[in-house]
Amino acid sequence: VPMGQVKNVYKALYPSNRWRDFHDFNAVSVYVPEMCFLAPDGKTIIPHYFDLSRSSSLLEAYPGKPFYTSDEYDRRMVKMDVANDGTLSNLSYFVEQGEFGSAVDKEGNLYVADGEIYVFDKDGKKKGMIRVPERPSTLQFGGKDGNTLFVTGRSKFFGVRIK
């Protein structure tokens, strides 16, 4: 469906990471495509990007909240604003670390998969590192209380209790 046709966007799903050989990561990340996939709920969109299938996962972007994604080529995380229509803008460099997936906890801390799992507060200050048995690629919070960080690696899937 056309991007502008969807009203009252609840969330958008964007690539968790991008590899851009042409060093056009910033422009591609805030580009607004003409079309999007619309979920059955009628308010969740997936903007149609030519490199959508290249990403290791999709991350949820909620209007009014910051969205983080990884620039694989330059190995850094960027932060963007999410508008009411689900589009991204105001890209800024957040931390000089990042390879694949990331996840944000209830307090706004950012967990970044980059060989290990690095933890940053909402201002970009490094809070720590979580060693894992295998190079992480995708991160997602879940569990009964939302305090388990689920991690995928090349051959393993495991959970790390955060609190």
What are these regions (language model features)?
Residues 5-8, 74-76, 156-158:
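Short glycine/acidic-enriched loop and turn motifs that connect beta-strands
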Residues 80-87, 161-163:
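Short loop/turn segments immediately following beta-strands, especially the blade-tip
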Residues 33-36, 76-78, 116-118, 156:
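A short loop-to-beta-strand structural motif that recurs across blades of beta-propeller domains
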Residues 150-163:
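Short, basic/aromatic-enriched C-terminal tail that caps enzymatic domains
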Residues 30-32, 74, 88:
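A detector of repeated loop/turn-to-beta-strand junctions in beta-rich toroidal repeat architectures
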Residues 1-5, 13-22, 29-35, 47-66, ...:
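Beta-rich, blade/repeat-based domains predominating
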Residues 39-46, 84-90, 125-128:
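Beta-strand initiation motifs
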